[in-house]
Amino acid sequence: MGEAAYVTVSALTKYIKRKFDVDPHLENIWIKGELSNVKIHTRGHIYFTLKDENARMQSVMFARQSERLPFKPENGMKVLVRGGISVYEPSGNYQLYAKEMQPDGVGALYLAYEELKKKLAGEGLFDDRYKKQIPAFPATIGVVTSPTGAAVRDVITTLKRRYPLVKVIVLPALVQGENASRSIVTRIEEANEKEICDVLIVGRGGGSIEELWAFNEEIVARAIFASNIPIISAVGHETDFTISDFVADIRAATPTGAAEIAVPHTTDLIERTKTAEVRMTRAMQQHLGQKKERIQTLQSSYAFRFPKRLYAQKEQQFDLAYQQFQAQLTALLDRKSRQLERETYRLEALHPHEQLKQARTRYQEQTNQLRKNMNIQMKQLHSQFQTVLGKLNALSPLQVMERGYSLAYKEDKLIKSVSQIEEQDRLEIKLKDGVLTCEVLEKRGEEK
């Protein structure tokens, strides 16, 4: 028998690990199971066991993958995990190195719930600033729920017991199943369009997450947000929270709790009325007491004890005030009279008749001055004319003719020399007192 061949544990483990690593079926595989022993390391790594009824597997998801998870893994959660199978050499155990994880079944609903909750919160649908006030004394309550469930009976019973005056209108709707969300939305919109109530209670009794899912639908949440009527959400039990609870104006733990929120209790109203009556009575008594003291004070005052003296004093004050008034009135009338005279004089000066009169006066003055200036000018011109005339007369031929001389003309031309005429020419001789027509018989020139 030959010597046996031995391998070390490490070598065998490495060999087995290589077998896992090169197997294409184990490199990228989806595994369905339940989470247990979940431990989240401070660095972000997640260590957990993935199991089913018959087996379990050690698993790990490193931080670079776990930080992308949209939910927090918890024990008992059904999940689908994608990853690769390999061997962890120090322990020799095979384990799953997870790359992706998502809830399975109900877990998927939970994931969708969280995603919608985050989306609507980001849009502000949960903000308190949009919450409407519930009326203190509503006349009509609308209830959107199943007409045959226990919830509607609990709501009606509680409303009538607490506040018999209220009117209850049931708006029947499907509260689970495929068409439930659309049915709930239709009833909410109908109540708003017809304005049939002061408050709406929207809800149902408890159930599984699948049964309550209609109240986690986005269309229901947006219908509640858009409602002009205040809405109380009452879905399931106290531990159940739906998207509708966050959007509604107020959330009640149960349908019965919603009814208690919607209306006051008659007994409480009676007690509040009695308390208010006592406070009003005390306030009236205190007010009347104060007025009584005031009247007593007035009755003991000087005016009530000596009314005639008060009258005489007031009469004296009146006389003094009247005299002051008369003096002020007289002074005022004097000022107004003087002002009126000044205004009258000014207006008369501006009157057309007065202005015409003044214009005539100015015209007459200017005319007289013009005539005076013209006379002076005429006298000056006449004197100058006489002077010039005297000079002209001294030079005028007529003055020469006055001394016995005459002027000879030939054909209207003055003859200055005998050379201008011939014998037989007809001449006109102008004397001082007439004209002679003559014929030249002979011309003789002067000897030089």
Swiss-Prot record:
The keyword Nuclease applies. GO terms for molecular function: exodeoxyribonuclease VII activity; nucleic acid binding. One of its GO terms (cellular component) is cytoplasm. InterPro entries: Exonuc_VII_L, Exonuc_VII_lsu_C, OB-fold_nuc-bd_dom. It comes from the Bacteria. It catalyses: Exonucleolytic cleavage in either 5'- to 3'- or 3'- to 5'-direction to yield nucleoside 5'-phosphates. Its EC number is 3.1.11.6. Keywords: Cytoplasm, Exonuclease, Hydrolase, Nuclease. It is found in: Cytoplasm; Cytoplasm, Nucleoid. Its main location: cytoplasm. Belongs to the XseA family. Heterooligomer composed of large and small subunits. Bidirectionally degrades single-stranded DNA into large acid-insoluble oligonucleotides, which are then degraded further into small acid-soluble oligonucleotides. This is Exodeoxyribonuclease 7 large subunit. The gene is xseA.
